Amino acid sequence: MIGPTLAPLFALVIVAVHRGLAAIGDQFAFDQVLPEPRTCIQDGCLQGRYYSDLEGRPYEAYLGVPFAKPPVGRLRFRNPVQNDPWSGDYDATWERSRCMQKNDVKPQQTVQGGEDCLYLNVYRPRNVTGPLPVIFFIHGGAFISGSSSMAEFGPERFMDTRKVILVTPQYRLAVFGFLSTEDRASPGNYGLKDQLFALRWTQRNIAYFGGDPKLVTIAGQSAGSSSVQHHMMSPQTRGLFARAVSMSGSALGFWHYDVDKLALTRRQAEVVGIANATELTTEQLVEELREVDGLELARSIDKLKVFYVHPVTLWQSTVERYVDEDTYMSEDPRVLWESGNYYPVPYTVGLLDNEGSLYSSIILSNRSLLNEMNDHSVEYIPLIVGAYHPTSVEMLKDRFFPDGSDERWLTEENLPNLQKMVTEGVFYHSIIKTIKQSVALKSRTSPLSVFYFNFTGPYSQSYLDTYTYGDFGIVHADELLYLFRSSGGVPDYQVGSPVWYMAKILVDYYVDIAYNGIAGPLCTAESCQLLEFTNSDNPNKPVALDLIDGFDEEMFTFWDKLYALQNY
């Protein structure tokens, strides 16, 4: 039964069906050549360009807009610095470089991008009166990869609605974004501070684009999801947004807390050939690292790994022990969240069925990697989920791989449990903990809602991750294929197809959040129903919106006990 709170969403399905795609035959043709769009902001004037949405109507794009000085040279491993204004028109018709990265989560990747990368894109519908709500979307990528590229995050589906403005920022990644000596020499959190700068830019300038600075929704996926939760807890971001959406990631995940940041920085120095790295003061260490070629720094991430790409999440947020006016976070996020010491805005949390495929699908698709992992089961398998305590290792073996030997855990029969283990440990536990601790607060004043994306379509991120067509189910980041046009990954959806309806419904759900704060059932301590997006057998309504009850409490308790042994 669809309750009153879901009536608007359910209506979206009906509306989409009844529209029947009449608009497609109504392809918008320009009667005349339009002058390119131009908008003046506090820093100067921007010359943008027009693109067409999926219905052929023009929308404005302002690409590669600077929000901070290039973090190069002496600005490497420093907090972002306000960019200088310019005279004349700034050419915002082309995308700038992605931040320097080696995406070692995917096979056969090389170093991409550059250090001069602190730019954002702004998209707005043409000839729509404002002020419009703003969606500020933070990309994922384990804090080591990703960009705001139109090829990955095409805005067309949001522009089709003609109801919101979309902002997509870039931020420093990996060693460039998160190197920390845990003191004044390099406090860290540069990637999060870059996002903060982009949020401040949005507050100062979005009204010039017809956006409403009082209705900014910050949304993110994976590492972007964790970033959203971090921003809710940082005192620096108060008042910069009005709603928040986290998809498939949490700031409470073990991977934020299982690395000695200073030891990692010294190890980083060693692998790029800095002599006596363990003996240098932190100031000397950072100065030496500033002199290393950026390409060499980015490439060296492979030398920091234990097995294949693991641990993936080495470069992470830091509790800043050196506190000044620029400090992003000086208290442990786990303490802040549990105590309710965060910005109380309407909050939506999302998760998918097979989140763990992000790490497991590549291994399961590669027999050589699988054999290597199995040969070192006791060391490598617990590493993936941050389990180092001997009792934790035993718990994993007993729960997921009971039929394996003590030396080789994996068998053909229990291989699916590898993905299940990663899904539960890396993703579900911390996401559910985020939700449980939030609704348990007696002082809580802001609403929370949870959605579960469980829709199977013809395309999947696992195809892009593994370069195969192996079926790993509904995997980490699959929902992005419906929110954004992915010209670099999948073809446009056929109008009227089930995937077309799914994309429209999910985008409208996000737009509803941008306008109203919450678009699904409320999650409370007494009752937490998840809004499920899934397939329907009804050809006239190919997307079903269902309500499912709560979470697997036994699973959550298992991981709670396991991570308590690690003191996460």
Residues of each region from the PLM?
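Non-transmembrane alpha-helical segments in soluble domains
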Residues: 135, 196-199, 203, 229-232, ...
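A structural signal for well-ordered alpha-helical segments within the folded catalytic domains
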Residues: 60, 114-118, 193-196, 200, ...
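Short, internal active-site loops enriched in acidic
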Residues: 140-142, 222-224, 294-296, 455-459, ...
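Short, solvent-exposed turn/loop segments enriched in Gly/Ser/Thr/Pro and often Arg
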Residues: 172, 219-223, 451-459, 521-534
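Substrate-gating cap/lid region and adjacent catalytic-acid/histidine neighborhood
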Residues: 295-500
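Serine-hydrolase-like catalytic core of hydrolytic proteins
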Residues: 24, 105-286, 337-360
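Classical eukaryotic N-terminal signal peptides for Sec-dependent ER targeting/secretion
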Residues: 1-13, 17
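Non-catalytic accessory segments of hydrolases
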Residues: 3, 17-192, 213, 487-506, ...
